[in-house]
Amino acid sequence: MARSVTVIFLVLVSLAVVLAIQKTPQIQVYSRHPPENGKPNFLNCYVSQFHPPQIEIELLKNGKKIPNIEMSDLSFSKDWSFYILAHTEFTPTETDVYACRVKHVTLKEPKTVTWDRDM
């Protein structure tokens, strides 16, 4: 009996430690296909390695929020960190600037990563 209580206690302590860990999100912004001005494409913002799972993601065009973006299901990795993909259709031009803005408890202010069409 004492052994099973000890095991349960250790499991609960381990779970509490996992839940207390905070990890800052890694952000990657890229297009599905090589960009061509005037040709429809998809803009992706892949956010990974974050914990806890509460997060806000916005895609931006020239600093303004793009409405009605799509989001994948929130998933987790082997290390219990989370990842998610935000994406939308877009048509790149020479002058438009696209970015992804992420708000998370580990960030003092929202982090914005600009799409680099040459990457």
UniProtKB/Swiss-Prot annotation:
Gene3D superfamilies membership: Immunoglobulins
Span of the signal peptide: 1-20
GO MF annotation, one: identical protein binding
InterPro entries linked to this entry: B2Microglobulin (IPR015707), Ig-like_dom (IPR007110), Ig-like_dom_sf (IPR036179), Ig-like_fold (IPR013783), Ig/MHC_CS (IPR003006), Ig_C1-set (IPR003597), MHC/Immunoglobulin (IPR050160)
A Gene Ontology BP annotation from the UniProt entry: positive regulation of receptor-mediated endocytosis
Pfam families according to UniProt: C1-set
Cellular compartment(s): Secreted
Chain ranges of the Ig-like C1-type domain: 25-114
Keywords, in A-Z order: Disulfide bond, Immunity, Immunoglobulin domain, MHC I, Secreted, Signal
Quaternary structure and interacting proteins, as annotated: Heterodimer of an alpha chain and a beta chain. Beta-2-microglobulin is the beta-chain of major histocompatibility complex class I molecules. Forms a heterotrimer with MR1 and a metabolite antigen.
Protein name as annotated: Beta-2-microglobulin
Organism: Rattus norvegicus
